[in-house]
Amino acid sequence: LLSAATAARAQFMSAELMGGSALNVPTPLSIQQAGFPDIHFTAHYDTKPFGPYAPYYTWRVDFWNKKHDRAWEVQQVHHRVFLTNTTPEVTAFAIHFGYNYLLAGRAWRMHGFMLHTDFGIIVPNPANTVRGLSINIGPNAVDTGYGLSGVGGQIAVSRQFNLAKHFYVLADGGFMMGRTTVPVVNGSATVPNVSFHGRVGIGVEF
């Protein structure tokens, strides 16, 4: 019992909450809508990390081994994308209620840094107006809610700076890729995303 208790104390978990922003690489956007030709073009997105609506954020929980050099982790990234090169047919297109990554993976401590690799699912909630028909925009728009409709992953590097015992601040940089399908009125849109993320936040160790 004593050895089991000692082993339990040797292991610990950390929890982190961060804000930040992302640089989105231009990616193809494809829209299929019943009764109309398909739409294909290269989409440019802004993150607008501070609003409108819920800002960009991420949280991460790590479960470290006894040596404190490897961990299993879970993470949510509340990413946001707003189309900036709208067209006469696509007058608004955003996933600002969340291009949400729900991820699980591994972390390693190396030379004072933490390396993270994670994979998981995407749960988006879109807002768009295509050919005058709107989802989640305006008082008469269709509200679709959240739905599981994609997969993605990330590679990230973080660095901690201790504030006090058990508390620290951190900086984190990540590269993320994902692909999801979201509804438009009478159709759907395929929305891949490739993005570079910068984050800062606070953490606590238990």
Q: Could you tell me what each predicted segment is?
A:
Residues 9-68, 203-205:
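Short glycine/proline- and aromatic-enriched beta-strand/turn motifs that initiate or cap beta-hairpins
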